[in-house]
């Protein structure tokens, strides 16, 4: 048995250089891009990117935008959504049906719809956004603020499908 395992390990060792070469030669799908954002200003830019497009965006929500970019900036973006009739659907662990988080009040519900999912099914501890051909992570916790946008049609499509499954489960 030991000789068999040693032989297998030797074969794996020999295959590593070939694998490394192949990985180095592989190309990112044409048009794919990854963007990294840091700090409050970076997250402001990310949210701007989310609301500065025409189609509905989807997401998982950890906290409302006020927590990271401030209520004034967040309400400007929410107003932009209303003005442009940009719809959004979000899944959260807890929902605020009073809309107390925004000065726009329940008028914001014209473009924003949310549902709750039990944290035992899915514990949400960061935000995600899906829009166009973009899937984005937005993280803020204990002073750490960063985000990543993945610009890739297939990844966005898959994430959108997973969101729709969760949307049906959420209430």
Residue ranges and their predicted role:
Residues 32-36, 61, 171:
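Short, small/polar-rich loop/turn modules that mediate ligand/substrate recognition or access, typified
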Residues 3, 10, 17, 44, ...:
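Generic alpha-helical structural signal
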Residues 1-33:
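Short, charged amphipathic alpha-helical surface segments
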Residues 38-151, 155:
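Hydrophobic protein-protein interaction segments
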């Amino acid at each position: 048995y030991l000789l068999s395992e040693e032989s297998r390990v030797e074969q794996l060792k020999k295959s590593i250089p070939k694998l490394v070469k192949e990985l180095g030669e592989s190309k990112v799908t044409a048009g794919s891009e990854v963007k990294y954002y840091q700090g409050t200003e970076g997250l402001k830019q990310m949210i701007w990117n989310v609301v500065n497009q025409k189609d509905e965006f989807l997401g998982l929500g950890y906290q409302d935008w006020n927590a990271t970019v401030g209520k004034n900036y967040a309400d400007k973006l929410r107003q932009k959504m209303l003005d442009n009739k940009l719809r959004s659907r979000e899944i959260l662990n807890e929902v605020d049906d009073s809309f107390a988080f925004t000065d726009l009040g329940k008028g914001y519900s014209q473009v924003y719809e949310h549902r709750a999912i039990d944290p035992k099914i899915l514990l949400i501890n960061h935000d995600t956004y899906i829009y166009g051909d973009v899937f984005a992570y937005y993280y803020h916790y204990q002073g750490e603020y960063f985000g990543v946008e993945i610009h890739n049609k297939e990844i966005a499509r898959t994430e959108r499908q997973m969101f729709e499954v969760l949307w049906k489960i959420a209430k």
